[in-house]
Amino acid sequence: MQKISKQLSAVISPFIFSACVSQSTIQDFNQQSAAKARVELALGYLQQNNPQLAKINLDKALQHDKDYYLVHSGLAHYYQQQGEIENAHREYEIALKLNNQQGDLHNNFGTFLCRQKQFEQAQQQFQLALNSPNYYHQADTFENMALCAYSAKKMDIYQQALQKLRQTDSKRAEKFNTFK
């Protein structure tokens, strides 16, 4: 009887352990990580000029985590590239409601607003980007501020942003020497 019990244990034990592993794997699945991976795939497809596959991945990202700012930021970028300005604007606003501490998000929204000739709102977003915690792309924002101010013919803001860009990244600021 003991021999049968040991043999039965030897046969059943692997199944019990594999069931535990399977259970753990399912529980460890992180919806936000899956959403982020889908957004990254979508951005890659956009770079390859494949908006259909980009949208499919963004929709799947939304299914994984509809409350993740990065999904809505990705959708905003998608709509922006497709020329769907109202949808892009809405998605930027949703992303900011979900997480307004992301400097890259403020910077991207500022760039979007500048392209829509909403210069004052764009400058506000750039300023919010610069004031965001743990934001390390100041040179990008100063460059965008300068370009936007130049487009709006706001030369005082342009000069201020350019000066900050020189202090942050002098090589990047050099390309503005052709602007007069």
Predicted regions: what they are:
Residues 40, 74, 108, 144, ...:
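Canonical tetratricopeptide repeat
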Residues 61, 94-95, 128-131, 164-165:
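Canonical positions in the second alpha-helix
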Residues 14-36:
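Bacterial Sec signal peptide processing site at the extreme N-terminus
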Residues 34-35, 69-70, 103-104, 137-139, ...:
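Helix-start (N-cap) detector for alpha-helical repeat units in TPR-like alpha-solenoids
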Residues 30, 64, 98, 132-134, ...:
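Structural marker of alpha-solenoid helical repeat scaffolds
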